[in-house]
Amino acid sequence: MSGEGLVSAAAAPEEQAFEAGLRPKNLDEFVGQRKVREQLSIMLEGARGRGRPPDHVLLSGPPGLGKTSLAMIIAEELGVPLRMTSGPAIERAGDLVAILTALTPGEVLFLDEIHRIARPAEELLYAAMEDFRVDVVLGKGPGATAIPLDLAPFTLVGATTRSGLLTGPLRDRFGFTAHMDFYDAAELALVLTRSARLLGVQLTEGGAAEVAGRSRGTPRIANRLLRRVRDYAEVRADGVVSREVARAALRIYDVDALGLDRLDRAVLDALVRRFGGGPVGLSTLAVAVGEEADTVEDVSEPFLLRAGLLIRTARGRVATPAAFTHLGLEPQSDQLGRSQAPAALFGEDLPAS
């Protein structure tokens, strides 16, 4: 994986086996998301006491925060099988019927990227979630008939990074909804300490803090950085991941103290040094860094916005005083005023000049 890919929250295919070995097995092992864990614990304990499947669960939030792990934990806590699929994999209603009719009583069905499920399949899911029934249509035209099929009671766990794309009827059928937030540095240090123990890595408190501070609030990124830092410690140090070793390793991989990578810094550098802090249109900024506009908007900007280094206004992108400081520069005298300009409606710019 490239240096820039190190701080991407998206899961790479080759990471599946690695992540599986680090996943928590129960709610007690799951670090962070305290309120979500407490709410889930109460719901699951109540369901076990009644001897019935719990309500359907919708987990939303950015990638890499543990939605898949929680789905696995729900099944484990209930002592039932888990079946996993994703919205893009269900292209036709028939695909969903095949999955639903194969479920055993009490089974947990995990549907990742549920916002991307095909509309015909989504509409079929309504009755399945509410009444544990699907209507299979036989034939076409006026002679078509609907045959109801009863399903075994099950619990659907849906996960989405784009909860705003869910339709109202689908959202309303979830009895339990939870939004997962980014982790703070202390929580990420706990995640790293646990992962280091499972991987047999000697990680000092300072080393954990250093990696946590560069992990963008995301456990997946923290664990990925830990692997690279471990390699450096074994090859160029004494095998112990200390604060100094972590800094040296991540310097090689172009991940700075805030978790910015090469592209992030290139965007900030162009915005500050070439355009005086902005405002500048997205297309112009993308040309300046030699990337597609979509790449800048989808890959770099989300974290720069969250880190308070950049804002989007009706006139274009503007660097904040913190961006100047991060690059070792003094903010311009009028930069505070420019960075407090009204944000663009829906995050859009006027056409770049």
From Swiss-Prot:
| An annotated GO BP | DNA recombination
Q: Where does DNA bind?
A: 312, 317
Subunit: Homohexamer. Forms an RuvA(8)-RuvB(12)-Holliday junction (HJ) complex. HJ DNA is sandwiched between 2 RuvA tetramers; dsDNA enters through RuvA and exits via RuvB. An RuvB hexamer assembles on each DNA strand where it exits the tetramer. Each RuvB hexamer is contacted by two RuvA subunits (via domain III) on 2 adjacent RuvB subunits; this complex drives branch migration. In the full resolvosome a probable DNA-RuvA(4)-RuvB(12)-RuvC(2) complex forms which resolves the HJ.
> Where do the record's region annotations for Small ATPAse domain (RuvB-S) lie?
184-254
Main location per the UniProt record: cytoplasm
**Organism, scientific name:** Parafrankia sp. (strain EAN1pec)
Gene name as annotated: ruvB
Q: Which family does it belong to?
A: Belongs to the RuvB family.
Region spans: Large ATPase domain (RuvB-L): 1-183
Q: Where found in the cell?
A: Cytoplasm
Name used for this protein in its record:
Holliday junction branch migration complex subunit RuvB
Asked if the keyword Cell membrane belongs to this entry, the reply reads no
